[in-house]
């Protein structure tokens, strides 16, 4: 156990989050080429491991602010192209997050959990999931707009049957989201998005948790077991079980 003062703890946390160390090309700001800016954003995603998505936008959406705070004046178009250019996918980490495609195997435990659970809080989908999946296979990615809309009422969570079916398949790994258009999720087959070397569920639940605990600790730099667990919404017991390996 190390004794760390408050100032040192703050610096460790800020450094680990990428808020003390400027990217070597960040000073170029908007003068950097679009390709370089996209590469900067992808490198940032790789270092952070996950970037949370949120519908709320004041100055900008949260996934854009993450890049601005660490990379400076990169273009919004470069951020969007990097996140939705085929090198990342969207799944449940801390919340709905953008994740590098290389992390697909690490969330096998969560996909298995959803499959075993058998339903979301909405219940089992009443829409024909097989027909939806076949349509995506034949026609390519679709959004809820292509299947009648996402909602069947005024309430935020009052989803349509098609939306429930798409989200259930997303949870279970039958579909993947690697792009948004007009902020709508575009659902596709994972085998068309995730590179073959990462497209597997071979890791055990314990192996998944061990890798995500390490990733969470690296991102936090310093923190309690509960804080490290919350990076990827793991049980605190998972952090305690793998603490000796950190």
Question: What does each of the following model-derived ranges do?
Answer:
Residues 1-246:
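Long, low-complexity intrinsically disordered regions
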């Amino acid at each position: 156990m190390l004794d760390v003062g408050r100032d040192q703890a703050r610096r460790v946390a800020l450094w680990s989050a990428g808020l003390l160390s400027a990217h070597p090309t960040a000073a170029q700001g908007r003068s950097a080429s679009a390709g370089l800016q996209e590469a900067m954003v992808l490198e940032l995603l790789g270092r952070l491991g996950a970037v949370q998505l949120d519908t709320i936008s004041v100055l900008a959406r949260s996934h854009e602010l993450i890049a601005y705070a660490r990379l400076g004046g990169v273009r919004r178009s470069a951020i969007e192209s990097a996140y939705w250019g085929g090198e990342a996918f969207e799944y449940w980490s801390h919340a709905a997050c953008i994740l590098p495609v290389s992390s697909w195997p690490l969330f096998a435990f969560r996909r298995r959990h959803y499959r075993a659970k058998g339903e979301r809080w909405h219940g089992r989908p009443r829409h024909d999931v097989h027909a939806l999946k076949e349509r995506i296979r034949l026609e390519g990615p679709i959004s809820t707009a292509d299947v009648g809309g996402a909602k069947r009422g005024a309430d935020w969570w009052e989803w349509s049957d098609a939306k429930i079916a798409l989200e259930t398949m997303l949870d279970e790994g039958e579909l993947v989201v690697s792009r948004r258009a007009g902020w709508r999720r575009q659902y596709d087959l994972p085998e068309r998005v995730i590179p073959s070397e990462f497209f597997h569920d071979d890791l055990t639940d314990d192996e998944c948790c061990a890798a995500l605990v390490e990733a969470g600790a690296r991102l936090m730099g310093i923190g309690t077991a509960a804080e490290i667990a919350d990076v990827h919404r793991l049980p605190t017991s998972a952090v305690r079980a793998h603490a000796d390996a950190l």
